[in-house]
Each structure stands twice: as C-alpha cells, then as structure tokens.
Amino acid sequence: MHNAVQNLQAITEWAESQSDDAVRVTSATLEAMVHILSGTSESVEQANHAIATARSLQFQPNIRESIPQVWALLDFVDLACSLVESNSNEAKSKLAVMQKLLDELWETAAWPEGGTLYIPLGQNHDRKLTDSTNGIFEREGNGNDKLSLQWLSKRDLYAVGYAISAIATLLRGSNDSKAHEYLIEGLKLIKADFKASSLDKPGINPSSTSLASATARFAWRQRMEWNLRLQLGFVYCCQLRWDAASRTVEQLKSGLVKLESCNSDDLQRWIKYLEATIAQGTGDLDKALAIYQTPLLKLPDLAPNRLPTVQHDLAILAALNQLLIIFPHSHHQHFRASALLASLEPLALHHHHKAIVSAIWFIKTLVDDEASATIMGRKQVLQHALLAARSMSNQQLLVQCMALMNNLFFRNIVGDQASKSLRTGWVLAKRNEGRSSQGDSESSGGGLWTAVAGSMYADLLERQSALKEAEQLREDTDAIVDQLPEKVKALFIEE
C-alpha cells in the first residue's frame, strides 16, 4: 500500500507540472481509494486530502466531461470516508451528490460499451508511445492521445451505486425501506446480466471483449450478486422477515460454489453471523449463542495503529450479542460475562463506528461492571450510549437506549418526568419500527420494541388512573406480541 501511495503521489506531482489535469484527478482519486483500503488509523484523513486535490480541479474546462467514471469513483470514495467514520449526516449529503451524478451519467455521459476508462493526455505527452504500446495509449480522431484502462460498465457502476446507497441509508437506522429498494434494484441489474437473452447486449457483454475479460467480468458480477444478497439478508432481519432471511442464507450457501476465487472463511463468517442473527431474532438463544462462539467469530488480535477489519467487526458484534444473551444471572454461562466484557472494551469503546461504541456502553449498563455499580454510575454509562447513538442519528439504538433507561429509572415512578420519558420512548419506538413493516405482509412481528415501550407506558397510565388509555395501549401491545415468533413471545410474556 505504501509503495502504491508513493507512486500515485509522484504521478500527481508530475501531472501538475505538466498541466495534465485529467491524469492528476485520476491519480489523486486512486490515491484516496488506496488510503481507505489501507485500514490505518490515519486513512480517512489522508484520503480526504487526496479527495480535496482532485476536487480542486473540477471546474477546469472540459475536465468533468472527459473522465465521467473517475468523478463517479471519487464520489464513491468520498462517501466511503463518511461511512468509515459513521458520520450519518455527512453520508446523507454525500449520498445525494453521488446519486445525482450517477443519474446524470446514465442519461448523458459518453461511456464506452465495454466500460473502458479513457484518460486524455496533455500536449506534453510523448506521442511516440501511442504508436508502440499496443493499445495502452490510443489516439482519438482529433489527434489527441489517451490512456485506456479496463473498468466497470455503466450497468456495473450503477449496481455498485445501489449497494453503497443501501449501506449509507442503513447507517441512520435499520428500518428505512429505501435500503431494501436499493438492494432489489441492484440485484435486478446484476441478475439480468446472467440471462441468456442478455448475453449479446453491448452494455453487458461487448463484442470486442476478450475471453479473459469476459470471464473476469462474469466472476465479478457473481460476487456482486452475492454481496447484494448478503446485505438483503440483514435488511430482512431488520424488517423481522425471518423466513425471507432464512431463504437468503440458503441462497448464499449455494452461491458459495460459484465463488471459488474468494476467501471461503471470509464468506462463511458472514453466513454464520447472519444465521446467528436469525436465531437470536426468533428467540432460539441457545443456537444463536453456539454460532456466536464458533472459531470463525472469535475475537482476533488488532495490530497497533490499524482500523478494525471486517473480521474484527463481526467478532466484536458476535461478542456483544453473546453478552446480551448471557448477562442475566440465571443464564448458565453468566460467569463468562465480566471477562468477555473486559476483553471487548479495548476494541469497542474507542471504535471508529459509533454504533459499536453505543452498543458497548449499552451492555455495560446491563452487565455487572464497576462503572455501573451505582445508580449515578449506571446513568452516566447509559448516557454515553445515548450520546453515541444520537451522534449518528441511529434511531434503532436510540429506541433501545430509551427502553433501557425507562426500565431502570422510571418503571415504578409516577410523575411528569416519568410520564414524558415513557411516552417519548413509546412514540420513538412506534415511529421507528412502523417504517419497517409498512406494506410488509410477510413480517412475522414488527414492533418488538414498540411492545416493550408500550407495555411500560401502559403500566404508568394505570398508576395514573388513565384506565381507558391504558386498556387501549394494552390491546395494541397484545396485538404486536401475538405476531412475534413463538420463542420470542414466550420470553416476552415470561418477563
């Protein structure tokens, strides 16, 4: 990575000295992408510096029209910086910019059918190279030379755009239906490419494509379909569509056979975590715990000055979910909770993703911990969880933090503060979870947290002698509970 960055920086400096703006934008954009892929603690800062270099040239004459694919890649990388830092507000605005550009490119940009990326070269380019490089440099009809690179077709780029749009949308909360829509559209694009009727379409398989290039493009589309389907599986979990999520697991398993060139452990790790999520969401806590404790999801060591990898993040999430299962004193593995929490804290408390920070503080409120041994200490710990959730506008985490706060501090209290807090928790849960089940006939129980918040609020209304309101709220809560998976329903009623 270090050598790649040095080479790209040298190209950028050389291009600046030659007033070769297209090359300069391209090399700065690629440098930003390499920084993000490097995973160092300074990667986002360094990527932003390279992005600023590229954007400083966006108003140069003809520069946007000459390299449309590069500007699209720059928007992708720019959005990725905000995703890495879990900055949901930045991500929202950058997502709008990216989508606007993609729509413009789809309608207007001159885009070679094979996805070839052409970088126009400045007048100081050694024109003899074009005659001796066998197609690496090409000459246009107007006599200008250009560098040709193999890249994504317009359809493939749009599929990537749908995938990134879904990730950015989920950053603010898991119940936004737009994420589901983006993934479905992305899958439609990719799946259409595999149909026999599509094989002779120029935008899918250009006639000039070599066998090696066509094979590589086909393999890329298979991996892209797998990744889109994986994201969709987690969206189904967020929507409480457990049957759809389970079907997705089977599709992912069968799809592994087609992905021979990919790291099997990496893909199996995702499948295992999705299976555990489904088991936990449907109340099969023993099965979920067993999967979370598999070697594939074991917490690995983290090298100094490195951001956590996907492997680290999945292991952290698996450990967090283990704690949610074993924290009750009655659980036969409760004795592991304190040690597991202690091993998690160095990885999670200062994680770059605020959702993980919020989750670890949330769990510290539950688990026997020195920081939350007193009422004041517990309030402070929960406040950290709330602040992290608010910083990224994550509605799902806010709902859960509010429910825990109300349960701990207002459960048997009558007063204005308790009334306001319990009602706020109920309204927030209802609004958040209502979005996940609108128009969803397959959902097996939208509104678990609405039921939790509604049940607590109904208790308060009864203590305030607002019996008619309490009765109506009980009926609404019972209707939600009736839709829950049987094992979840049993746990809810037991509590």
Regions found by a protein language model. Give the residues of each.
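Extended alpha-helical scaffold regions
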Residues: 1-495
